[in-house]
From Swiss-Prot:
Gene encoding the protein: vanC1
Domain ATP-grasp: 134-336
Predominant place of localization: membrane
Localization per Swiss-Prot or TrEMBL: Cell membrane
Official protein name in the record: Vancomycin C-type resistance protein VanC1
Listed SUPFAM superfamilies: Glutathione synthetase ATP-binding domain-like (SSF56059), PreATP-grasp domain (SSF52440)
Length: 343
C-alpha cells in the first residue's frame, strides 16, 4: 500500500488555515488505497510524525499530545525516526503562505528526492512574489492594477505622493510576499497611510501600493500537469470592505458564487488568461488564479495561489466540484499528478 505523507503547520501566519485544510485532506484520502502519514511542523520548525486523533490537528492541540508526537529528521531519501528510515511515496504539503508556497518546502522535498503535490521551486517562488508575477504577466499581455514597489530601505515619501496623485484613492497597501490577504489594508486617505505601511512591512521587506480596482473578484481553478482541467470560475461579493483573511476563512459578510454569473465571452477570456499564466509560468498540480473584473469587462490579474485553501468551504475544491470532481476524487487526482510529475 502506498504511503502518503500530509504536511501541515509551519512558521507561517497561515498556520491555523494549514491545520484545517490538512485535516480535510487527510479525511478525504481513501484508507483502503493509501496509508496516511500525518506530519506536523511546529511553529519552531521542528517536524513530527503525529499519530494521534485527527481532531487534535483541526483544533490545534496536537503538539500537546506528546505521546503521539515523534520527532523526525531528514535524509537524502525521506525521514529518519530513531533508527528507522521512512520514505513516503508522495508528500502532500498542505502549507500556505510563507515557507509553504514560496519555494522553500519544495526545495527541501527536491533535496529529499520525494514526489510532492503542487508546483516546483521556481514557479512557487515566482507566484509568491506579486511584483515579479505582475511583471511577467505584463509580457504576456495580461494586465495588473497600477502598482508601486517599495522596500524597507527605499520608500521615498515623494514617490508615494506622486503615485497617489496619479492614481488617487482608494489604494491597497499589501506585503509583496504573503498569502491569504495577510497584512493588507485598504487606504482611503493619507491619514491611514503610515499605519498601513507599518502593517505590511511586518510581513516582509517589500511592500506594494496598488490602485484599487472597482469591480468584482473572480477566481479560476486549474488542475493538471500536461492535461488541464479548468474548474468553474467563482465570484466574490462583499457587503463592505475587501476579501481579507477573516472573510476568506469565516465568511462574515462575503458571498461566494460558483459558477460566477459572467457572460460566456468574458468567462472564456478569464479562463484563457488563467491557462496562459499556468502554462507560461510552469505551474504543475494545481493553482487558483485570481482576477479583478470591472463593470466594463476589463480583466486585471490579482494573484496566484499555488496551494489554495482546502477547508470544507474553500474556493478551489468548490470550483472543481462544479465540474464534477468531488473533494475525494480531487485529492486522489492530485496524488496521481505528483507521481506522474516525478516520472
Amino acid at each position: 500500500m502506498k504511503k502518503i505523507a500530509v504536511l501541515f503547520g509551519g512558521n507561517s501566519p497561515e498556520y491555523s488555515v494549514s491545520l484545517t485544510s490538512a485535516a480535510s485532506v487527510i479525511q478525504a484520502i481513501d484508507p483502503l488505497k493509501y496509508e496516511v502519514m500525518t506530519i506536523g511542523i511546529a511553529p519552531t520548525m521542528d517536524w513530527y510524525w503525529y499519530q494521534g486523533n485527527l481532531a487534535n490537528v483541526r483544533n490545534d492541540t496536537w503538539l500537546e499530545d506528546h505521546k503521539n508526537c515523534h520527532q523526525l529528521t531528514f535524509s537524502s531519501q525521506g525521514f529518519i525516526l530513531g533508527e528507522k528510515r521512512i520514505v513516503p511515496d508522495v508528500l502532500f504539503p498542505v502549507l500556505h503562505g510563507k515557507y509553504g508556497e514560496d519555494g522553500c518546502i519544495q526545495g527541501l522535498l527536491e533535496l529529499m528526492n520525494l514526489p510532492y503535490v503542487g508546483c516546483h521551486v521556481a514557479a512557487s517562488a515566482l507566484c509568491m512574489n506579486k511584483w515579479l508575477l505582475h511583471q511577467l504577466a505584463d509580457t504576456m499581455g495580461i494586465a495588473s492594477a497600477p502598482t508601486l514597489l517599495l522596500s524597507r530601505y527605499e520608500n521615498d515619501p515623494a514617490t508615494i505622493d506622486r503615485f497617489i496623485q496619479d492614481h488617487g484613492f482608494p489604494i491597497f497597501i499589501k506585503p509583496n510576499e504573503a498569502g491569504s490577504s495577510k497584512g493588507i489594508t485598504k487606504v482611503t486617505d493619507k491619514t491611514a497611510l503610515q499605519s498601513a505601511l507599518t502593517t505590511a512591512f511586518a510581513y516582509g521587506s517589500t511592500v506594494l501600493i496598488q490602485k484599487a480596482i472597482a469591480g468584482i473578484e473572480i477566481g479560476c481553478g486549474i488542475l493538471g500537469n500536461e492535461q488541464l482541467t479548468i474548474g468553474a470560475c467563482d465570484a466574490i461579493s462583499l457587503v463592505d470592505g475587501f476579501f481579507d483573511f477573516e472573510e476568506k476563512y469565516q465568511l462574515i459578510s462575503a458571498t461566494i458564487t460558483v459558477p460566477a454569473p459572467l457572460p460566456l465571452a468574458l468567462e472564456s477570456q478569464i479562463k484563457e488568461q488563467a491557462q496562459l499564466l499556468y502554462r507560461n509560468l510552469g505551474l504543475t498540480g494545481l493553482a487558483r488564479i485570481d482576477f479583478f473584473v470591472t463593470n466594463q469587462g476589463a480583466i486585471y490579474l490579482n494573484e496566484i495561489n499555488t496551494m489554495p485553501g482546502f477547508t470544507g468551504h474553500s474556493r478551489y475544491p468548490a470550483m472543481m466540484a462544479e465540474v464534477g470532481l468531488s473533494y475525494e476524487i480531487l485529492v486522489e487526482q492530485l496524488i496521481a499528478l505528483a507521481e506522474e510529475d516525478k516520472r
